[in-house]
């Protein structure tokens, strides 16, 4: 069986005319039968795609021929099945959304630390180690003694820093994420906030798992990935987790035995959070999936990730509105 090559890539680079790249890039991906999503913004490119080895090599060559997109940071892994259903190239305001204006990793960023040097750094008792990923990612694996900010989205990270980190107290801060891109912005943000010694794992967790032997590793658990593999183990192979198709949370085999788990409809993480309308929609979607399987057809279904992201953005907007009202009340008192 031919292995599917999964390629995670990103590059921060000024792309003032990024909109013009979308059409030819999408056409190239479709012609090569590459699946997955790439994001384009004025600050660069980011995404994960999959295809044959020849197709991925062709994509990297194509990107290398485009002005500014040469030498893109990328990491390869392999799967027995295609982990994506669609081919997308999206235009965005940011290639990784922090929601803070003026943060530019091209101007200021933390110190890159090679995977081979990472263990020594995070073993330093003076270093505070922060996992910049979302809580559901951290739950299934992280580095030993890492701090979990318990965020739902990367947008919440600046508030975590504001409430929990102090440049006068925390002299050395080390951060990490899946592939390195979130740390480009998180370290840039901390530098802007006055933190001096700020470090991040070059290439992210995936590069560390690739280059550091398991017996020498300080990684504990599995690494969440944003595709149908759900998580990968230290060998970068599909791990033990499945994913709830309703809320996209990673779930164990034990959780799938729970009465709250109904395939495609609910799990212990979301059973009390989804509405009756959502439940009906998920039941119908699962019925369509099963019908497609019976006909030996692929069923793409609705983009649940968009639903989840919309829900999180709504909650974030509500939090911002509440904070603005609270600040307004304080101003009136003063």
UniProtKB/Swiss-Prot annotation:
Q: Which GO terms describe its biological process?
A: tRNA modification
The EC number on file is 1.14.-.-
Q: Which reaction does it catalyse?
A: uridine(34) in tRNA + AH2 + O2 = 5-hydroxyuridine(34) in tRNA + A + H2O
Q: Which PROSITE patterns match?
A: RHODANESE_3
**One GO molecular-function entry:** oxidoreductase activity, acting on paired donors, with incorporation or reduction of molecular oxygen
Cite the active-site annotation. Answer: 177
Keywords in UniProt for this one? Answer: Oxidoreductase, tRNA processing
Question: Which protein family is it in?
Answer: Belongs to the TrhO family.
Name this polypeptide is given: tRNA uridine(34) hydroxylase
Species, as recorded = Shewanella baltica (strain OS185)
The uppermost taxa in this organism's lineage are: Bacteria, Pseudomonadati, Pseudomonadota, Gammaproteobacteria, Alteromonadales
What would be the name of the gene that encodes this protein? trhO
